[in-house]
Amino acid sequence: MNLHEYQAKQLFAEYGLPVSTGYAVDTPEAAVEAAKKIGGNKWVVKAQVHAGGRGKAGGVKLVDSYEEVAAFTQNWLGKNLVTYQTDANGQPVAKILVESCTDIANELYLGAVVDRSTRRVVFMASTEGGVEIEKVAEETPELIHKAIIDPLVGAQPYQARELAFKLGLNPTQIKQFTKVFLGLSQMFHDYDFALLEINPLVITDEGNLHCLDGKIGIDSNAVYRQKKMQEFHDPSQEDEREAHAAKWELNYVALDGNVGCMVNGAGLAMGTMDIVNLHGGKPANFLDVGGGATKERVAEAFKIILSDSNVKAVLVNIFGGIVRCDMIAEGIIGAVEQVGVNVPVVVRLEGTNAEKGREVLANSGLDIIAATSLKDAAEQVVKAAEGK
């Protein structure tokens, strides 16, 4: 679960970190009032969506009049912002953040993630702020400095100082950086973050550190115990199909291909996507129905896949270990009858009750293509998606 920038900065402020004075608004009139309340003659207005690249897409602007504040707000509210991190439809803008203007002398990067290789929270800092950190990591990895947090003792001031030295900060800035570092680490622990980024963490003209942006991702497995984070949840920023799938305990991720995939098990699902790609197809989704799939969940999974208008064919690939193939077959039949499928369906069943499952499908009277192997299934579904 992700947070909006204004929500992240609200948390930063609660932990005593330096952020700009700002207000999240949902009308042009409220935006003008926010600018008046902030004061000054320049403001930054930012469209609030769960995606990076807003500036290049026109979703962030420096303005110097109340008319511009109102015009920007009027222009973006209710519209979708498309960036390099969104799909072609973009994400809806329901809030605009109006902030005071900050003079920038230098831009840094500070972030933290849960690193699976070390099984620790790892902080990363770089002098290359304001750009995509992935690009920095790929092209100049030596410019990214790391601090690994021991979960038994937590973040320590000396770790902050080590990073600050590598960033070339002066003594006053080192003290400020230490406060920011320790505050972020505590916040990361308190709210079960999975990702945290301040990009950029700027040095102002006065030489002070300032959190100019904020990106936070919450561990979805921990949201149930984070009541405050639940209040920050914005369902409008989620893919409708993904949100619907989550209610049925289905692991679904929308992609941009035309071959719908329904598989049991994450590993098999990824392997299925790979083999579809290998044979010239493009998966429209990742969907894992899980080992404890029921007939109802399978039917719902089928409906979710078919709700994507880009899907031209569906591949059902089931290995019956815990789940029974005949039950999956009944779910497929139920879904096809309910939804009214008008695209080819290729089914590959192996494992527990596979023969019975194939028999159920064969006797259903439905136009379902039976595959004899995984390779055969991939070849058949790619051909079907191409209309061959």
UniProtKB/Swiss-Prot annotation:
Enzymatic reactions: succinate + ATP + CoA = succinyl-CoA + ADP + phosphate; GTP + succinate + CoA = succinyl-CoA + GDP + phosphate
Record's keyword terms, sorted: ATP-binding, Ligase, Magnesium, Metal-binding, Nucleotide-binding, Tricarboxylic acid cycle
HAMAP family assigned: Succ_CoA_beta (MF_00558)
Pathway the protein contributes to: Carbohydrate metabolism; tricarboxylic acid cycle; succinate from succinyl-CoA (ligase route): step 1/1
One of the GO biological process terms: tricarboxylic acid cycle
Residues at which ATP binds: K46, G53, R54, G55, E99, T102, E107
Cofactor: binding comment: Binds 1 Mg(2+) ion per subunit.
Pfam families membership: ATP-grasp_2, Ligase_CoA
Binding positions for Mg(2+) per the UniProt entry: N199, D213
Span of domain ATP-grasp: 9-244
UniProt xrefs under InterPro entries: ATP-grasp, ATP-grasp_succ-CoA_synth-type, ATP_grasp_subdomain_1, Succ-CoA_synthase_bsu_CS, SUCC_ACL_C, Succ_CoA_ligase-like_bsu, Succinyl-CoA_synth-like
Enzyme Commission number, as recorded: 6.2.1.5
Entry's Gene Ontology molecular function annotations: ATP binding; magnesium ion binding; succinate-CoA ligase (ADP-forming) activity; succinate-CoA ligase (GDP-forming) activity
Database matches in SUPFAM superfamilies: Glutathione synthetase ATP-binding domain-like (SSF56059), Succinyl-CoA synthetase domains (SSF52210)
Description of how the protein assembles with itself and partners: Heterotetramer of two alpha and two beta subunits.
Gene that this polypeptide is encoded by: sucC
Keyword field contains Nucleotide-binding: yes
Entry binding sites for substrate: N264, G321, I322, V323
Family named by the database record: Belongs to the succinate/malate CoA ligase beta subunit family.
Co-factor requirement: Mg(2+)
UniProt name for this protein: Succinate--CoA ligase [ADP-forming] subunit beta
Gene3D superfamilies: ATP-grasp fold, A domain, ATP-grasp fold, B domain, Succinyl-CoA synthetase domains
